[in-house]
Each structure stands twice: as structure tokens, then as C-alpha cells.
């Protein structure tokens, strides 16, 4: 159990990658504080963990608000006495429009959720992480490396997190605190599959052909990398961007079209996930199709 006796805060823990990371960390021995917006099924995830014998505390609030972020950190320390790991996973992908048509309110929501939340949680958690020589993990994106047409603010927000993670890693190294960023490609969640999301059905159909491995990733595959980076096995890893994207970042053309059908299947889920495709609930996605 790589995370035995460690305490982790996971933001955006109600659905998708956050839900999978919560279950993976508990399976590896961690005790967790699961944070999410009031409409997110965070309490349900905590109840499933508790039913399986794990320890989880649910915290509901808008972590882009200073008071809520501070209170989340305080709740973790009050419940478990310390913090070893912070997973800055919360974020939104809420609009599909060329930059001249991108609504200012969607831009501001993206900045608040994706940047401000991560900054505030990092700020308030660091004094506790310095005591435990803990580590911080961020959910970045391949879009933050390559850029993304029609989602320019989203890609830019992830690019900020990449640079922020590196800066925190350099700054906090003398405290023994590590910081790393995982950069997923297209993952099988509500953001990339089904109606009502930011991707058109045409783009959704082409994803598997654009990814060299010929398929979307699963939330569990991202959680597996988070678990390694959070563990002492990664003690010499800091300031790193970990691409977990099926090869889409260096790819050109439709490399995935050559992958045989049997390799296109997403691996079977081993974690008790119930909300992998619920991430859009209450997020008010805006599409400006042309």
C-alpha cells in the first residue's frame, strides 16, 4: 500500500478523474478529504469509500472563494491531523467557440475554477505540507502544451498550471515539498463523450482516430499515475509534466485509425466508480457552433 497513513485532499473529487483518484488513493492506504461544488456527488463518493472500509471526509464549497479554500484545508487538518498530499484536480471545460466569439463570462469562469482554485488550495495547504514534507499534484492537459483551437482559454489555463507546478516545485524544494503535474489527453468522461458537452459529436467521433493508441483514456489510468507521484516511490520526481495522453501530443494526422479494434477498448474498470460521466452536471456548457 503505497500511500499507507498518508492524508490527501482531492479537489473535483465527485466525478471523473477526481472520483477515480479518490478510490485509488484509498485502495493504496490513504485517508482522503474529497472536495467539490455543492451540486457534485462528493458525498456519494465518500459514502462508497466508507462502505468499503476506507476513511473519507466530504467537503462541499466553491474553492475559488478564499474562505472556502481555507476552510477545506482546515477541515482536513481537523479531521486527520495533517496533510501529506494535495491533488489540485478541480477544473472546468465549458465552452466551444473561436476566441472572438468566446463569452467573457465563460473565460472568467474558466480562470476562477482552473487557476484561482489551484492557487488558493496550494497557498493554504503549503504550511501543512511543509511540516510533512508532502507533495502537490495538478491536473494539467495536453491542451496546455499544444494549445487548442476553439478552447483557447481552457488550454491557456492548463498552461498556467504547468508553469505554476514547476515554480512551486523549485520554490518549495528546500522544505522537502514536491510538486508535479499530470497532463491527460482525451479521457472517457462527460467532457469528451455524449450530448451536452463542449465537444461536437463530430469531434467526439474523431478522437479515437487522432490518438495513436486508438482510444480515450480512462479516469483510472490517470489515477494510477497520480498514485505513483503521490507515493515515496516518486521521491526524486519534482517539477515534472507527465503526459498521460495516449500519444496525442506528438501525434500528427489520424494515427489511431491504424489501431486494430481489439486494442481500442478502454481497460476494464477495477475501482467502484459511479460518476465517471456526471461531470457536466450544473456546469452550464456553452457551444458557439459555426
Named regions from a protein language model:
Residues 7, 14-16:
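Conserved glycine-rich cofactor-binding loop
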Residues 28-44:
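Conserved glycine-rich Rossmann-like NAD(P)H-binding loop of the short-chain dehydrogenase/reductase
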Residues 97-99, 103-108, 207:
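Substrate-binding pocket helix/loop in short-chain dehydrogenase/reductase
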Residues 122, 157, 165:
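Active-site helix of classical SDR
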Residues 127, 170-174, 235:
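Alpha-helical segment proximal to the catalytic Tyr-Lys
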Residues 141:
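Residue(s) in the substrate-gating loop at a strand-loop-helix junction
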Residues 181, 201-237, 242-246, 272-290:
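C-terminal helical subdomain
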Amino acid at each position: 500500500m503505497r500511500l499507507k497513513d498518508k492524508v490527501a485532499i482531492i479537489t473535483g473529487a465527485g466525478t471523473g478523474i477526481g472520483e477515480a483518484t479518490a478510490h485509488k488513493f484509498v485502495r493504496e492506504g490513504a485517508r482522503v478529504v474529497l472536495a467539490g461544488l455543492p451540486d457534485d456527488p462528493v458525498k456519494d463518493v465518500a459514502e462508497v469509500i466508507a462502505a468499503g472500509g476506507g476513511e473519507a471526509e466530504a467537503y462541499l464549497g466553491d474553492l475559488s472563494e478564499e474562505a472556502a479554500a481555507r476552510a477545506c484545508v482546515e477541515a482536513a487538518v481537523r479531521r486527520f491531523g495533517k496533510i501529506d498530499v494535495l491533488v489540485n484536480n478541480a477544473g472546468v471545460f465549458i465552452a466551444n467557440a473561436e476566441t472572438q466569439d468566446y463569452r467573457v463570462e465563460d473565460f472568467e469562469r474558466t480562470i476562477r475554477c482552473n487557476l484561482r482554485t489551484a492557487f488558493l488550495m496550494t497557498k493554504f495547504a503549503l504550511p501543512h505540507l511543509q511540516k510533512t514534507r508532502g507533495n502537490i499534484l495538478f491536473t494539467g492537459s495536453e491542451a496546455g502544451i499544444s494549445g487548442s483551437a476553439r478552447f483557447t482559454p481552457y488550454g491557456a489555463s492548463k498552461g498556467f498550471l504547468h508553469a505554476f507546478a514547476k515554480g512551486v516545485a523549485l520554490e518549495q524544494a528546500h522544505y522537502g515539498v514536491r510538486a508535479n503535474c499530470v497532463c491527460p489527453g482525451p479521457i472517457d468522461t462527460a467532457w469528451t463523450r455524449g450530448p451536452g458537452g463542449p465537444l461536437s459529436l463530430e469531434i467526439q467521433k474523431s478522437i479515437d482516430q487522432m490518438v495513436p493508441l486508438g482510444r480515450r483514456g480512462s479516469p483510472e489510468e490517470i489515477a494510477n499515475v497520480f498514485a505513483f507521484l503521490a507515493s515515496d516511490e516518486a521521491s526524486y520526481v519534482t517539477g515534472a509534466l507527465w503526459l498521460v495522453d495516449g500519444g496525442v501530443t506528438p501525434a500528427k494526422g489520424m494515427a489511431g485509425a491504424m489501431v486494430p479494434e481489439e486494442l481500442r477498448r478502454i481497460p476494464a474498470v477495477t475501482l467502484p466508480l459511479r460518476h465517471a460521466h456526471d461531470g457536466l452536471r450544473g456546469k452550464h456548457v456553452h457551444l458557439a457552433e459555426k
